[in-house]
Amino acid sequence: MTIVVGFEGSANKIGVGIIQDGKVLSNPRRTYITPPGQGFMPSDTARHHRSCILDVLQEALEESNIKPEDVDCVAYTKGPGMGAPLLSVAIVARTVAQLWKKPLLGVNHCIGHIEMGRLITGAENPTVLYVSGGNTQVIAYSERCYRIFGETIDIAVGNCLDRFARVLKISNDPSPGYNIEQMAKKGKKFVELPYTVKGMDVSFSGILSYIEDMSHKMLSSGECTPEDLCFSLQETLFSMLVEITERAMAHCGSQEVLIVGGVGCNVRLQEMMGVMCEERGAKIFATDERFCIDNGAMIAQAGWEMFRAGQVTNLQDSWITQRYRTDEVEVTWRD
């Protein structure tokens, strides 16, 4: 029996999760929410995390009925992410590991998403679409590495959605992406937007610039509604993602797709990916908001896999990094 506590705080979510041999014992989190039209600053986000991380840890321990002496390892997000929030959480994880006299493990944020998705859905060897506010990658496992076959060449798909939400002054509660999804369901007119796919890579900065420039004119003239723009943006972005995922599946000979990351909660994205998979005779796997959105349990699960494979992070090496690519990690726990 192996129990791992995981700390996640790479962006505006702070979470602590506890995993015991593939079972999620607890997974509380808090979200830093800013007013409509605003993003979240690293310093303010870090301040939020510092103010509530111990309460979240206490909640996780109480919910799981786990005591410090029961824990085998403490895992934390090493990166990628926002520097100040990452550092705040890493300091707490280091302190907890020393107080409890437990080994420490630095975990790649993306690997956490993948391993949590595999655990929850039962996907065996899928092509992974990782879509969030900071990342957009198409990934597949090969020779002890999660290899990136396609990715954004500029901004992430979630960042594109978030920044457009600011243009329309859409609420950030519970998240701008979720609120865009709800508005898109009411859209009736499709507005043609730039579509940029280069092989298995995508670009979202052009479509964002275009819709930012044109939205005021379109809305003021009555040419379309905010709901129409949300609908059009979603359809265009998600079509691009489905295209590069299918291309990666064909390249890898894969019959499974796993969608992870915060944008992976979007039901419309899952529907569009499902249509493609059905036409290919493939299976689609996705999780709900409990595990798609950043959470501590995913870091605990990746830490559990790493710890069982004999990995630990020395205290002097327990730094954080804002840039930490998925394919930099040697996946020692898979055949």
Swiss-Prot record:
Gene3D superfamilies: 3.30.420.40. Its EC number is 2.3.1.234. InterPro entries: ATPase_NBD (IPR043129), Gcp-like_dom (IPR000905), KAE1/TsaD (IPR017861), Kae1_archaea_euk (IPR034680), Peptidase_M22_CS (IPR017860). Keywords: Acyltransferase, Cytoplasm, Metal-binding, Nucleus, Transferase, tRNA processing. Disulfide bonds: none annotated. The keyword Cytoplasm applies. GO terms for molecular function: metal ion binding; N(6)-L-threonylcarbamoyladenine synthase activity. One of its GO terms (biological process) is tRNA threonylcarbamoyladenosine modification. Binds 1 divalent metal cation per subunit. It catalyses: L-threonylcarbamoyladenylate + adenosine(37) in tRNA = N(6)-L-threonylcarbamoyladenosine(37) in tRNA + AMP + H(+). It is an enzyme of class 2 (transferase). One of its GO terms (cellular component) is nucleus. Substrate binds at Y130, V131, S132, G133, G134, D162, G177, E181, N266. A divalent metal cation binds at H109, H113, Y130, D294. It is found in: Cytoplasm; Nucleus. It comes from the Eukaryota. Its cofactor is a divalent metal cation. Component of the EKC/KEOPS complex that is required for the formation of a threonylcarbamoyl group on adenosine at position 37 (t(6)A37) in tRNAs that read codons beginning with adenine. The complex is probably involved in the transfer of the threonylcarbamoyl moiety of threonylcarbamoyl-AMP (TC-AMP) to the N6 group of A37. Osgep likely plays a direct catalytic role in this reaction, but requires other protein(s) of the complex to fulfill this activity. Component of the EKC/KEOPS complex composed of at least tp53rk, tprkb, osgep and lage3; the whole complex dimerizes. NCBIfam families: arch_KAE1, gcp_kae1. Belongs to the KAE1 / TsaD family. This is tRNA N6-adenosine threonylcarbamoyltransferase. It comes from Xenopus laevis (African clawed frog). The gene is osgep.
